Amino acid sequence: MNTAPSRPSPTRRDPYSFGDSRDTRRDRSPIRGSPRREPRDGRNGRDARDSRDIRDPRDLRDRRDSRDIRDHRDSRSVREARDLRDFRDFRDLRDSRDFRDHRDPVYDRYRDIRDSRDPLYRREGSYDRYLRVDDYCRRKDDSYFDRYRDSFDGRGPPGPESQSRAKERLKREERRREELYRRYFEEIQRRFDAERPVDCSVIVVNKQTKDYAESVGRKVRDLGMVVDLIFLNTEVSLSQALEDVSRGGSPFAIVITQQHQIHRSCTVNIMFGTPQEHRNMPQADAMVLVARNYERYKNDCREKEREEIARQAAKMANDAILQERDRGGPEEGGRGGHPPAIQSLINLLADNRYLTAEETDKIINYLRERKERLLRSSADSLPGPISRQPLGAASGSSLKSQPSSQPLQSGQVLPSATPTPAAPPTSQQELQAKILSLFNSGAVAANSSSASPSVATGSSQNQNFSTAANSQPQQRPQASGNQPPNIVGQAGSARNMGPRPGAPSQGLFGQPSSRLAPASTMASQRPVSSTGINFDNPSVQKALDTLIQSGPALSHLVSQTAAQVGRPQAPMGSYQRHY
């Protein structure tokens, strides 16, 4: 057939398009198809042509060719509508179910960041940390600037010099923190040692076994323990004394009786952990038991105590560092000291930028905490010592001078715990004889109590009673109705005057007198003021009658025996004795 086509068919395309050489502007990105992999038969454009093939502007073919399926309106057109069915290259070896964005940094490692195909795409590189100051200020004015992206704390440009200064500041703070920690640890350790209760309390039931109890205390002391010697009286039971010792914090208590002295034994009570009581143990076995449990006590309790001391010291050191940072040193500048997150919020607030309610609350809470730290810095660095009553003094006062009608209380402080003028033990029988003789001879000076209203003042009772007895020799059979307030005033003044040489005190001379017990009981329970006393109470009336009968005689007797007492001695109840 000689029928010639109206238009010759196109010839085979060159591997490098119609140019003389390969286009040098083509890159080797895996996103765009490589020219080496393009099929040479371009007649099947739907299947064999690269979907990402971009027409070269130097292609000089006739754009009116109907068989050229690429759009001639834009030489940069990526694909036509039929190619939108699958936007990936069939030669792409990735899984067809993988729909990750090809702009992911993993797939963008070979792309030039200056490529204009995606100018809005921004890579998150590490070089953003090394911005210049002018770049930072320019970006801060940008409305799309991410304020949480850069940790710029305001101490200088975030460059190598700023990092070196920050490292030096951190090293300096660490050295200062270590120094403060050691100092606070030693101070808190000394405070804990001063407030630590005794390790073992030796309770002596009878005073006849004092020597044996002291020998046991010395052996316990040789184990490295602090020992306290406690003498019981007949008015307090042993269980109450042990409860008081346990409440005071002592881990061990040893009870000594006459039977223990005879058999050279003792009763060991272990207070910490599970309470234990080992009765009538031989002295050697008791020392072994106490030593073994004391080591366990030190390992358990002292380790916890050391952890508590370390925690308090670390907290105080951190608070001191924060206070110093808030004050700011000359090398840190005026804006230094704020945390980076808070500093960025403060900068935004200073620039009148928008802050959310949560960010505003952060700034308010930070400023409130800083104000509290400044207020605390004005006070002492160390908290006040914990008020703890000495075990020996509290137990002694409660065990010796407390009447039988009152229960034993560890926190009770009685007036007899303070040193009061007391007669020597050798003159107790003589004083008792004088008191009985005065009682039997009648109320010789009973009227002196009503005629001396100056007793309630600051003068001493010795001079008042002697003056009243010499100026008014007349006798009155019984006290009138207006005398109880005066007598109560005398008792109140005696409590107010305190331990003066010659003033009678409650629990006088440490004697368990049957006539003085109600008076001492009411005096220890009644407040200083006499306005709140119920005089209709029978016990109050009985105590007042006892004071009326015995008050002047006792005061006169004290004035006579005051010269015999060389120096004020501690009462029998003050038994605290540390080895």
Curated annotation (Swiss-Prot):
Modified residues (Phosphothreonine): 3, 274
Comp. bias intervals (Polar residues): 461-485
Region spans: Transcription repression: 1-158
GO cellular component: actin cytoskeleton; nucleoplasm
Compositionally biased region (Basic and acidic residues): 11-77
Phosphoserine modified-residue sites: 9, 21, 29, 34, 96, 116, 126, 143, 151, 378, 381
An individual GO BP term: negative regulation of insulin receptor signaling pathway
Subunit structure: Binds HTATIP2/TIP30. Interacts with YLPM1. Forms a complex with ILF2, ILF3, YLPM1, KHDRBS1, RBMX and PPP1CA.
UniProt note: domains: Contains one Leu-Xaa-Xaa-Leu-Leu (LxxLL) motif that is essential for the association with nuclear receptors.
Record's protein name: Nuclear receptor coactivator 5
